[in-house]
């Protein structure tokens, strides 16, 4: 992949274990865009981060030629509109609309619901697992007959839904609660295998061992019992 | 191709108002269908099986869900007139950012203003005012959020105005005294035909909210 002009400055303020940060790296890498990654300590935010994202104070922030863009889905669209090689959103307006819908669904429904499992036990936890599974079933059905959510190749929703494939599913591994059992979600498991066959995904998702350690430490801090 | 456009909506919804405005900005003829949210139609359940919420835009039989996504769809499909998003990628990103901010911050904050009481309401009011001030600051001295032209963020935000009198009534404050520039922007937007035709009478919204509030705050 050709390198961009040297006059272009692309910086990403992110965090190595954040799904929202990693998805930006996937998109940039897919597009062959060189960038400088600035790891942020989210417990001690840098003055640069607070300056670049004064509203939400959250990573990721993409800085392109000095201009900051925040919110991972907004950043992904910006990347797709700015660097047009290897488009990640469909060209057709209706298909593009559906990609936006499913991406919002992943972040605002699946993620928000799954996160509620933190601190819960017994029947309360079971209820969250059930609610999460109900939502995942929509994704399961969307995958029927496709290698990727983007169709035959990696697309916008695949990049966004790495959150499910590598964060949600790794977290369940640590917590010991089956949220995505293969017998209920065979399409999702097939899709994860396809993702793992993609070079950009393999390069950009957090290394499994380190990530599992990080999740375990975080869960212990949150007093979640490990299996 | 016959352009069949149906909008499943509920008259006081600030989200439905967005889609109404966007369609009118583009001069698109559409059939408005009022939904009874306590007795949702089979069409709504079929067209939005995940969220079961309005507004649903149905274009030639195909559903588009989520108001802010609908606005983008309308902008892309009927791209010949009154562009809603700027053409520059950075400005587009900024517009998307602020629309997202409104959806994530303003909606939840406003709910605490009319659906709670006591200390919770006071805290909610404070948050709400802070968010409006952030938006007012972003507007600055521009006539509209993206600059000279009415657009995406204006469409995302203006419908909330119809609920302002209800907030003021139940939380006992004046929004105009807190964010005068924002109210000046409201008045400018209301002069637009697409907006004027799409927004309900704030008094009727206040009546609606009064009834709604009884469910949340028993007297």
UniProtKB/Swiss-Prot annotation, chain A:
<dbReference type="InterPro" id="IPR036249">
    <property type="entry name" value="Thioredoxin-like_sf"/>
</dbReference>
<keyword id="KW-0808">Transferase</keyword>
<dbReference type="GO" id="GO:0005737">
    <property type="term" value="C:cytoplasm"/>
</dbReference>
<comment type="similarity">
    <text>Belongs to the GST superfamily. Tau family.</text>
</comment>
<dbReference type="GO" id="GO:0006749">
    <property type="term" value="P:glutathione metabolic process"/>
</dbReference>
<feature type="domain" description="GST N-terminal">
    <location>
        <begin position="8"/>
        <end position="87"/>
    </location>
</feature>
<comment type="function">
    <text>May be involved in the conjugation of reduced glutathione to a wide number of exogenous and endogenous hydrophobic electrophiles and have a detoxification role against certain herbicides.</text>
</comment>
<dbReference type="InterPro" id="IPR004045">
    <property type="entry name" value="Glutathione_S-Trfase_N"/>
</dbReference>
<dbReference type="InterPro" id="IPR045073">
    <property type="entry name" value="Omega/Tau-like"/>
</dbReference>
<keyword id="KW-0216">Detoxification</keyword>
<dbReference type="InterPro" id="IPR036282">
    <property type="entry name" value="Glutathione-S-Trfase_C_sf"/>
</dbReference>
<dbReference type="Pfam" id="PF02798">
    <property type="entry name" value="GST_N"/>
</dbReference>
<feature type="domain" description="GST C-terminal">
    <location>
        <begin position="92"/>
        <end position="215"/>
    </location>
</feature>
<protein>
    <recommendedName>
        <fullName>Glutathione S-transferase U7</fullName>
        <ecNumber>2.5.1.18</ecNumber>
    </recommendedName>
</protein>
<dbReference type="GO" id="GO:0009751">
    <property type="term" value="P:response to salicylic acid"/>
</dbReference>
<feature type="binding site">
    <location>
        <begin position="71"/>
        <end position="72"/>
    </location>
    <ligand>
        <name>glutathione</name>
    </ligand>
</feature>
<feature type="binding site">
    <location>
        <begin position="44"/>
        <end position="45"/>
    </location>
    <ligand>
        <name>glutathione</name>
    </ligand>
</feature>
<dbReference type="GO" id="GO:0004364">
    <property type="term" value="F:glutathione transferase activity"/>
</dbReference>
<dbReference type="InterPro" id="IPR045074">
    <property type="entry name" value="GST_C_Tau"/>
</dbReference>
<keyword id="KW-0963">Cytoplasm</keyword>
<dbReference type="GO" id="GO:0005829">
    <property type="term" value="C:cytosol"/>
</dbReference>
<dbReference type="Pfam" id="PF00043">
    <property type="entry name" value="GST_C"/>
</dbReference>
UniProtKB/Swiss-Prot annotation, chain B:
<dbReference type="GO" id="GO:0005886">
    <property type="term" value="C:plasma membrane"/>
</dbReference>
<feature type="binding site">
    <location>
        <begin position="53"/>
        <end position="54"/>
    </location>
    <ligand>
        <name>glutathione</name>
    </ligand>
</feature>
<dbReference type="GO" id="GO:0004364">
    <property type="term" value="F:glutathione transferase activity"/>
</dbReference>
<dbReference type="InterPro" id="IPR004045">
    <property type="entry name" value="Glutathione_S-Trfase_N"/>
</dbReference>
<keyword id="KW-0560">Oxidoreductase</keyword>
<comment type="similarity">
    <text>Belongs to the GST superfamily. Tau family.</text>
</comment>
<keyword id="KW-0963">Cytoplasm</keyword>
<dbReference type="InterPro" id="IPR045074">
    <property type="entry name" value="GST_C_Tau"/>
</dbReference>
<dbReference type="GO" id="GO:0006979">
    <property type="term" value="P:response to oxidative stress"/>
</dbReference>
<dbReference type="GO" id="GO:0009570">
    <property type="term" value="C:chloroplast stroma"/>
</dbReference>
<comment type="function">
    <text>Catalyzes the glutathionylation of 12-oxophytodienoate (OPDA). In vitro, possesses glutathione S-transferase activity toward 1-chloro-2,4-dinitrobenzene (CDNB) and benzyl isothiocyanate (BITC), and glutathione peroxidase activity toward cumene hydroperoxide.</text>
</comment>
<dbReference type="GO" id="GO:0006749">
    <property type="term" value="P:glutathione metabolic process"/>
</dbReference>
<dbReference type="GO" id="GO:0043295">
    <property type="term" value="F:glutathione binding"/>
</dbReference>
<feature type="domain" description="GST N-terminal">
    <location>
        <begin position="3"/>
        <end position="82"/>
    </location>
</feature>
<dbReference type="GO" id="GO:0005829">
    <property type="term" value="C:cytosol"/>
</dbReference>
<dbReference type="GO" id="GO:0005739">
    <property type="term" value="C:mitochondrion"/>
</dbReference>
<dbReference type="GO" id="GO:0004601">
    <property type="term" value="F:peroxidase activity"/>
</dbReference>
<dbReference type="GO" id="GO:0005737">
    <property type="term" value="C:cytoplasm"/>
</dbReference>
<feature type="modified residue" description="Phosphoserine">
    <location>
        <position position="198"/>
    </location>
</feature>
<keyword id="KW-0575">Peroxidase</keyword>
<dbReference type="InterPro" id="IPR036282">
    <property type="entry name" value="Glutathione-S-Trfase_C_sf"/>
</dbReference>
<dbReference type="GO" id="GO:0009507">
    <property type="term" value="C:chloroplast"/>
</dbReference>
């Amino acid at each position: 992949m050709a390198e961009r002009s040297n006059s272009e400055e692309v910086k990403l303020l992110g965090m190595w274990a954040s799904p929202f940060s990693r998805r930006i790296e996937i998109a940039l890498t897919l597009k062959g865009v060189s960038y400088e990654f600035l790891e942020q300590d989210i417990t001690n935010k840098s003055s640069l981060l607070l300056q670049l994202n004064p509203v939400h104070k959250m990573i990721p922030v993409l800085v392109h030629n000095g201009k900051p863009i925040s919110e991972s889905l907004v950043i992904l669209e910006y990347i797709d509109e700015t660097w047009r090689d290897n488009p990640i959103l469909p060209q057709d307006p209706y298909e593009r609309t559906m990609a936006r819908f499913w991406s919002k669904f992943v972040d605002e429904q699946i993620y928000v619901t799954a996160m509620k499992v933190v601190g819960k036990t017994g029947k309360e936890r079971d209820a969250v697992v059930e609610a999460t599974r109900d939502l995942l079933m929509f994704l399961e059905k969307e995958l029927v007959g496709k290698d990727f959510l983007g169709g035959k190749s990696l697309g916008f929703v695949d990049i966004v839904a790495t959150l499910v494939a590598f964060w949600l599913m790794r977290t369940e591994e640590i917590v010991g609660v089956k949220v995505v059992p293969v017998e209920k979600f065979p399409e999702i498991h097939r899709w994860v295998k396809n993702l793992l066959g993609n070079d950009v995904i393999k390069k950009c998702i957090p290394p499994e061992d380190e990530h599992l350690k990080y999740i375990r430490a975080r869960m212990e801090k949150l007093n979640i019992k490990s299996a | 191709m016959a352009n069949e456009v149906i909008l499943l909506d509920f008259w006081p919804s600030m989200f439905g108002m967005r889609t109404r405005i966007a369609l009118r900005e583009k001069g698109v003829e559409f059939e408005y269908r009022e939904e009874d949210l306590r007795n949702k139609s089979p069409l709504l359940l079929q067209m939005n099986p995940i969220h079961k919420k309005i507004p649903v835009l149905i274009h030639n039989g195909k559903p588009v869900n989520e108001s802010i996504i609908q606005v983008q769809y309308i902008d892309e499909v009927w791209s010949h007139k009154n562009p809603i998003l700027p053409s520059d990628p950075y400005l587009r990103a900024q517009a998307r950012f602020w629309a997202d901010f409104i959806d994530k911050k303003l909606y939840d904050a406003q709910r605490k203003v009319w659906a709670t009481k006591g200390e919770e309401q006071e805290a909610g009011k404070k948050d709400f005012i802070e968010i409006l001030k952030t938006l007012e600051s972003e507007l600055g001295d521009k006539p509209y959020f993206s600059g000279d032209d009415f657009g995406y963020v204006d469409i995302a935000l203006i419908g909330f105005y119809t609920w302002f009198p209800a907030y003021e009534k139940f939380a006992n404050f004046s929004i105009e005294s807190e964010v005068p520039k924002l109210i000046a922007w409201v008045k400018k937007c209301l002069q637009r035909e697409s907006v004027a035709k799409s927004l309900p009478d704030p008094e009727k919204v206040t009546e609606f909210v009064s009834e709604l509030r009884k469910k949340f705050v028993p007297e």
